[in-house]
């Protein structure tokens, strides 16, 4: 029985790929609904007009294809990097951070077109279904959300491929002559899952990596770059002021050429299972190292340590899909306040998968060489003061030791 009989018009997050092309036809045939397609250019590097052509062939009248690269980096990626956010110590959240923006536009387009539902192609096993829907409900509590993977009878990607063949929907092939890996990509990263990658004991084939040279084949000569920061955001490379998306794209090029940003990860999904993914985040890996380096000069110790304590919770909120939650916004306000004086330049050496800090400088620096010098500090610091500092900090330890000696 069709539980969506009252749905007349649906906005579909449409990539033009296998899953969403099948979903489009399923929405038309099973629901009898009018479908509006929305394709976001987040820097995935694909020719998006093919999505328009596929949608037109399938009878779609309202087609939205939008370049959201600048908004994506400015309003989502950069705020996240101010926090130095990584999930489970290593994952730079490239997929997670893209979902709130897509959901935001789905809701906006639904209102513009009079649609009463939105739809996405995330499976019932993954995190993306949660991220899309939590974001959508945060922006429109009454929106209807259709997740075909949770409703239809297909059980696997093999079933989808057979459906596609029956309905003459093209299926692209990868280098092994089989159906493609499950791939997600945007300006921040790319990820690959599925097929041979589902066995975490087997190394990922080299052809899975789409965005980086292997460190072994990267140039033998290092690349030196300087990144400029203002209020915690990267604003320039080698002295040239750049827009957020242009800057990240250039960092991606540097990272690609030097084999930087590869990650083979088994992660804990929000839904409770573990999954294995191959991630490439070349520009983001460079940016994270540079941002931490400029913070080391300009952030007070207390603020820096508190940020590091809050970061895992902040990263978890993004990974789980709570970008629009009050707690994420509260943390963001604190993080943004901490970035007021985070400005200056960081010089990096990029070499065969490594990002090495060569130097950093800032007019807002809290590093004073007269305080730390091993030479004559001309009275800037009286070493005798350390004795009282140590004695007071040792008081509770001495008290504990005294009690132990009595016992």
From Swiss-Prot:
Main location: cytoplasm
Signal peptide, first to last residue: none
GO biological process: argininosuccinate metabolic process; L-arginine biosynthetic process; urea cycle
Entry binding sites for L-citrulline: 91, 96, 127, 131, 182, 191, 267, 279
Localization of this protein: Cytoplasm
Binding site for L-aspartate: 123, 127-128
Any one GO molecular function term: argininosuccinate synthase activity
EC number: 6.3.4.5
Binding-site residues, ATP: 13-21, 40, 121
Reaction catalysis annotation: L-citrulline + L-aspartate + ATP = 2-(N(omega)-L-arginino)succinate + AMP + diphosphate + H(+)
PANTHER family registered for this protein in UniProt: ARGININOSUCCINATE SYNTHASE
The protein's name in its UniProt record: Argininosuccinate synthase
């Amino acid at each position: 029985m069709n539980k969506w009989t009252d749905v007349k018009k649906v906005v579909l997050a449409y990539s033009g790929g296998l899953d969403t092309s099948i979903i489009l036809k399923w929405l038309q045939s099973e629901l009898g609904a009018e479908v509006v397609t929305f394709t976001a250019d987040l820097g995935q590097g694909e020719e998006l007009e093919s999505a328009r052509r596929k949608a037109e062939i399938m009878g779609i009248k309202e087609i939205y294809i939008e370049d959201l690269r600048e908004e994506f980096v400015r309003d989502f990626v950069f705020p996240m990097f101010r926090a130095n956010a990584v999930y489970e110590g290593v994952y730079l959240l490239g997929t997670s951070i893209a979902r709130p923006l897509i959901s935001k536009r789905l809701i906006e387009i639904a209102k513009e077109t009079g649609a009463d539902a939105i739809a996405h192609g995330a499976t019932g096993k993954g995190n993306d279904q949660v991220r899309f829907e939590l974001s959508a409900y945060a922006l429109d509590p009454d929106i209807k959300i259709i997740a075909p993977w949770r409703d239809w009878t297909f059980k696997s990607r093999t079933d989808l491929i057979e459906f596609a063949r029956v309905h003459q929907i093209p299926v692209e092939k990868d280098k092994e002559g089989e159906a493609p890996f499950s791939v997600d990509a945007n300006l921040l990263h790319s990820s690959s899952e599925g097929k041979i990658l589902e066995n975490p004991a087997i190394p990922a084939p080299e052809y899975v990596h789409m965005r980086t040279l292997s460190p072994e084949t990267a140039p033998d000569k290092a690349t030196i770059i300087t990144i400029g920061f203002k209020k915690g955001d990267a604003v320039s490379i080698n002295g040239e002021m750049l827009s957020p998306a242009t800057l990240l794209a250039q960092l991606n090029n540097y990272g690609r050429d030097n084999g930087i940003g590869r990650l083979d990860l088994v992660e804990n999904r929000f839904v409770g299972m573990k999954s294995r993914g191959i991630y490439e985040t070349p520009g983001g890996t460079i940016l994270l190292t540079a941002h931490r380096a400029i913070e080391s000069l300009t952030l007070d110790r207390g603020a820096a340590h508190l940020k590091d304590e809050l970061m895992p919770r902040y990263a978890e909120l993004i990974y789980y899909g709570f970008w629009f939650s009050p707690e994420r916004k509260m943390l963001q306000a604190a993080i943004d306040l901490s970035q007021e004086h985070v400005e200056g330049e960081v010089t990096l050496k990029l070499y065969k998968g490594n990002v090495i800090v060569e130097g950093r400088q800032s007019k807002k620096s809290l590093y004073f060489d007269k305080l730390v010098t091993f030479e004559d500090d001309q009275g800037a610091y009286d070493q005798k003061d350390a004795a009282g500092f140590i004695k007071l900090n040792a008081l509770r330890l001495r008290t504990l030791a005294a009690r132990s000696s009595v016992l």
